[in-house]
Amino acid sequence: MGDLNKHTFLSRVFGSASNPLLNDDNNDIEFSINNLQDTFEEHQVESPPRAPHPINVNSEDESSSETESASNEDLLYDQKRELYQQVESELRQDDYDTVPESLMMERRRPHEGSTRTIGTKIPPSPAEPPIGPNITQWGEKARGIASRTLDNIPKTIAKGISFQLPANASSKLPPPPLSYRRETSVGGETEMAQNINEQRQLRGRLGLLSPMERALWLWSNVSNLDTFLEDVYGYYTGNGYRCIILSRVSDLLIIVFVVWLTSFMGNCVDYNQLMNGNATKYSDVVVDKCYSKISLSQKLFFLVLFAILVLRIKSFYSHFKDLKEIKNFYNLLLGVSDEELQTISWSTIVKKIKVLRDQNTNALISGNQNLRGDDLKSKKRLSAHDIANRLMRKENYMIAIFNKNVLAPALTIPFINHHFLTKTLEWNLKLCIFDFVFNTDGQLKQAVLSEHKRLALATEMRKRFRLAGILSIFLTPFLVIYFLLYFFLKFFYDIKTNPSLVGSREYSPYARWKLREFNELPHMFDKRLKMSRARATEYINQFPKEATNIILNFVAFVTGSLVTILVVLTVLGHENFLNFELTEGRTVLFYISTLGAVFTICKGSVSENDTVFDPEASLRYVAQFTHYLPNSWNGRFHTEEVKNEFCKLFNLRLILVLKEITSLIMLPYILYCRLPDVSEKVIDFFREFSVHVDGLGYVCTFAMFEFDSKDKPVRSQAANDDDDLKQEYYTADDDKMVKSYLYFLESYGNESVRKTGKEPAVDRISRRPGKKNLLRSAMMNNSMMDKSRGAQSTVRYPPQFRSPNLAESVYTKRQNIDLMEDTTAGLSTDTRNYLQTLNNSTLLGESFQHGFPVEDTTHHEEDADSEDDDEAGVLGLINQIYKHKEGVN
């Protein structure tokens, strides 16, 4: 009989306007009869008859005459009227005034106002099952729940970022459709209005819901899927409710401690009394009423720090309620406890979200009746690829900006020729660029995509850069003082206890954006860099530093000898020898501590003699984690130039701290003078590298992994004409998009291979003459394969693509995989399975299914790539010996 509104129990309690939760069961549809007659009249001209529906109208034997049809309508009305009176009498008998909307029936006769065409007949339908007892049962249940919870209804609804309910939600809810008026009551209208108001408040609040029902209600009423997924991912990376609370409380206490310690040490300590040595106790050096003597500049400094503290506390309080909702989402809907959250993989979480969406499609779509069509599509698209695009909508643009060197001219310091990017500058870039081109919902503004508004937008962005530069002039003094204190307190004790940390290295902020892949979530990227740090340090340390080692060994010998003498004299001398002053004001204890620290630093900085100098092997091993090995480095891995370029990416941590502090001073110059010059290039970048996807909105072109786009194809050869130059412009540098695609496949596992009968795009590309080199280059960069042929190198790795079809094995023989297992640590077993089968998982979504039929490639002849045999290097020699043994056997 058509698509009728399927009510749930909660929709019968709160009203159909809310329609909050999942469908209870198939029998619930029996009670959705408020629009029965309208639907009946709307569909009675349709033919042929449809299959029986759970909602049925009782009718007698089918008759083709108009008289019999009218009698059937009268019978239907009598049954409905009798049922209505039964419900009304039961509720009145129990002193319950309001009839739920889902139980309301039409008062008019079904044939009144009907425009049914003469000669048509009503489709037959089976008899209606008895529903009287069920109505009584649900009526009592609704009344019982309402009576038990009216006294405990919360006065306010928890507001959150993801699940924000409108403040006037209760006033927008429609009144109950039917209220029984007591004829004997004097104030009948007043009592009816009071009942209407109570029911409106009852439906507008969530106090009636259990934690599970509330979680389902919020899941079905998500209005901003980007923000919701960011909250879900933030809860995952924060390791659960307790860890997030402790972390944020700790951050607040650190700010409080720094503010208090700074104010106390700067104003409440008499340093003259302390340094003279006359003070013997704490009260002798404390200044009375010290805070009343604070200068105006100090008051401004503490006022800024106090404002930061207040903003952090406000942000913490606003997110506190959201954390509870996300906790219920994980614990109740996904079935993941906070303890398990610290060990479960993100791909498993994505799979659970996808299963939850599939099991609750109706509730998810019907939860918010005001959603647009695009919003409905967005809630249907929850594959791993779609979720990654939502979480990294802005980050993908940032990765592409550094990949295409859009900001390179502005961030290059004159006379230094070095990219200058720090965390503080990065924060200002996001504030000036991304907060300008994206709206409050996290979507790209339509004006950015209009070429006619290019100059106006560029002018506005130029003003934002200069305004930020002016503001940074006033904020720089306070920020410099704060960060000096913060870094001093953070690193001093670590360096004192472990002086070798002075020589520790870390990837710079510029390197992090340069090395990051498209759609690579932060925790996956951090894991990849952590695995590369040890090997990267080995690569740098193996370079000979003979002159430096000689100096360090000399200083270590002198300081170690002096410390040894002082320690021996301390043991043999009297008990006050440590207080003996070797120089004026400097005791033996001071020199033992100072010289001991110098000895430890020098000794830890001396290169070890047991390292083997093989920079190419080391750097290629690092490249399987960093996925970064420029063509310009080929054949020059042993040179100081390549080492210095790599050191700019993997710099000393102490230098990075100094650059962070220096950037606060240079920030006004970069923001006001350098960055405004690239405003037009930034606007052009967002317009030319954005693509709209139904259900996702505008995303970065490279993040969609589209390899077959005609207007923006992937190129592997140098540009020779204007068309090639244009295509080169629209292509990601360093084959980053292909590498990102392959790493994305590796990261999200190979569960549930999809049997679609369609060939993946990468597999099709691999058979094209111009594309095979591209994929091979990308995989060599992602693994331990040799990227350059013909270049002089000390180590050559045997794995090569022997077939144009990636469906065949990457390695020519299975024995080669076992032999070279230690050199392919960056490739998991799942990755090798991908490269052998290269089918796409249902977890990855439809973005990876591009539409050509699978072709039989088993009989394809080998092309020019078959001659890429690897015969050079030590490992190549081992491979040849291994093949020789096979021939002998």
UniProtKB/Swiss-Prot annotation:
<feature type="transmembrane region" description="Helical">
    <location>
        <begin position="249"/>
        <end position="269"/>
    </location>
</feature>
<keyword id="KW-0812">Transmembrane</keyword>
<dbReference type="GO" id="GO:0034045">
    <property type="term" value="C:phagophore assembly site membrane"/>
</dbReference>
<feature type="intramembrane region">
    <location>
        <position position="396"/>
    </location>
</feature>
<keyword id="KW-0333">Golgi apparatus</keyword>
<feature type="topological domain" description="Lumenal">
    <location>
        <begin position="490"/>
        <end position="549"/>
    </location>
</feature>
<feature type="transmembrane region" description="Helical">
    <location>
        <begin position="550"/>
        <end position="570"/>
    </location>
</feature>
<feature type="topological domain" description="Cytoplasmic">
    <location>
        <begin position="321"/>
        <end position="395"/>
    </location>
</feature>
<feature type="compositionally biased region" description="Pro residues">
    <location>
        <begin position="123"/>
        <end position="132"/>
    </location>
</feature>
<dbReference type="GO" id="GO:0030659">
    <property type="term" value="C:cytoplasmic vesicle membrane"/>
</dbReference>
<comment type="similarity">
    <text>Belongs to the ATG9 family.</text>
</comment>
<feature type="region of interest" description="Disordered">
    <location>
        <begin position="41"/>
        <end position="77"/>
    </location>
</feature>
<feature type="topological domain" description="Cytoplasmic">
    <location>
        <begin position="1"/>
        <end position="248"/>
    </location>
</feature>
<dbReference type="GO" id="GO:0005776">
    <property type="term" value="C:autophagosome"/>
</dbReference>
<keyword id="KW-0968">Cytoplasmic vesicle</keyword>
<feature type="topological domain" description="Cytoplasmic">
    <location>
        <begin position="397"/>
        <end position="468"/>
    </location>
</feature>
<dbReference type="GO" id="GO:0005789">
    <property type="term" value="C:endoplasmic reticulum membrane"/>
</dbReference>
<keyword id="KW-0472">Membrane</keyword>
<keyword id="KW-0597">Phosphoprotein</keyword>
<feature type="region of interest" description="Disordered">
    <location>
        <begin position="108"/>
        <end position="132"/>
    </location>
</feature>
<dbReference type="GO" id="GO:0034727">
    <property type="term" value="P:piecemeal microautophagy of the nucleus"/>
</dbReference>
<dbReference type="GO" id="GO:0006869">
    <property type="term" value="P:lipid transport"/>
</dbReference>
<feature type="transmembrane region" description="Helical">
    <location>
        <begin position="300"/>
        <end position="320"/>
    </location>
</feature>
<keyword id="KW-0445">Lipid transport</keyword>
<feature type="transmembrane region" description="Helical">
    <location>
        <begin position="469"/>
        <end position="489"/>
    </location>
</feature>
<dbReference type="GO" id="GO:0000422">
    <property type="term" value="P:autophagy of mitochondrion"/>
</dbReference>
<feature type="intramembrane region">
    <location>
        <begin position="652"/>
        <end position="672"/>
    </location>
</feature>
<comment type="function">
    <text>Phospholipid scramblase involved in autophagy and cytoplasm to vacuole transport (Cvt) vesicle formation. Cycles between the preautophagosomal structure/phagophore assembly site (PAS) and the cytoplasmic vesicle pool and supplies membrane for the growing autophagosome. Lipid scramblase activity plays a key role in preautophagosomal structure/phagophore assembly by distributing the phospholipids that arrive through ATG2 from the cytoplasmic to the luminal leaflet of the bilayer, thereby driving autophagosomal membrane expansion. Required for mitophagy.</text>
</comment>
<feature type="topological domain" description="Cytoplasmic">
    <location>
        <begin position="673"/>
        <end position="889"/>
    </location>
</feature>
<dbReference type="InterPro" id="IPR007241">
    <property type="entry name" value="Autophagy-rel_prot_9"/>
</dbReference>
<dbReference type="GO" id="GO:0034497">
    <property type="term" value="P:protein localization to phagophore assembly site"/>
</dbReference>
<keyword id="KW-0256">Endoplasmic reticulum</keyword>
<dbReference type="Pfam" id="PF04109">
    <property type="entry name" value="ATG9"/>
</dbReference>
<feature type="topological domain" description="Cytoplasmic">
    <location>
        <begin position="571"/>
        <end position="651"/>
    </location>
</feature>
<protein>
    <recommendedName>
        <fullName>Autophagy-related protein 9</fullName>
    </recommendedName>
</protein>
<dbReference type="GO" id="GO:0000139">
    <property type="term" value="C:Golgi membrane"/>
</dbReference>
<keyword id="KW-0813">Transport</keyword>
<feature type="topological domain" description="Lumenal">
    <location>
        <begin position="270"/>
        <end position="299"/>
    </location>
</feature>
<keyword id="KW-0072">Autophagy</keyword>
<dbReference type="GO" id="GO:0061709">
    <property type="term" value="P:reticulophagy"/>
</dbReference>
<keyword id="KW-1133">Transmembrane helix</keyword>
<comment type="subunit">
    <text>Homotrimer; forms a homotrimer with a central pore that forms a path between the two membrane leaflets.</text>
</comment>
